[in-house]
Amino acid sequence: MIKLKIKYGNSQTDIRFPCTEKEMNAALERIHAEDVTPLELYVSEVIFPEELGCLQDRFVNLDEVNFLGKRMDSFFGDEEYQFYEAMKLEGFDTLPDLINLSFNLNRYPLIQDIGDMGKIGREYLLTVNGCIPAHDEDDPKYAQLGRELIQSGNGIFTEHGM
């Protein structure tokens, strides 16, 4: 969920995304912006999540924010952390970039438990390929891949993992 304080003229209101068209229209009516086209309004504050602070103090397209909110609501497991870490890594700060990133999280594996080399290899392949065979979970090739990934130096340690 995304919650922003939007401003139009001297009026402000909070709006949560994703939202229905009815909820969007009600919020726009509260600030007398129902006739604004294109639907770009000023964000005076990003209430939640703080990681989207890049949207604050700028004009944004509310339809794009709503679409991003829908994408973020569909995140599963650690995908939200993946999204925030990839966003920071790449320096993405525009809505089109953030929406695009939400469709490409498989390019940014996030491994939270780096104590087990086999688990690192399995999680990496699962993120990048989308699946791994269930019958060879204990195969040493995953531990070897995990060691190679750690030794490559390409991994970046973050507050949510590597």
Model-predicted segments: where are they?
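Generic alpha-helix signal with a bias toward terminal, lower-confidence helices
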Residues: R16, A26-E29, L55, D136-E137, ...
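Alpha-helix initiation and N-capping motif
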Residues: E21-M24, G118, Y142-A143
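Mixed-charge (acidic/basic) macromolecular-recognition segments
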Residues: L28-C131, D138
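Short, extreme N-terminal segment that most often corresponds to the first beta-strand
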Residues: M1-A26
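Acidic, proline/glycine-rich low-complexity IDRs
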Residues: R122-M162
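Short, flexible beta-strand-to-coil junctions
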Residues: K5-N10, D35, V46-F48, H160
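A generic structural micro-environment signature
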Residues: E21-E23, P49, Q151
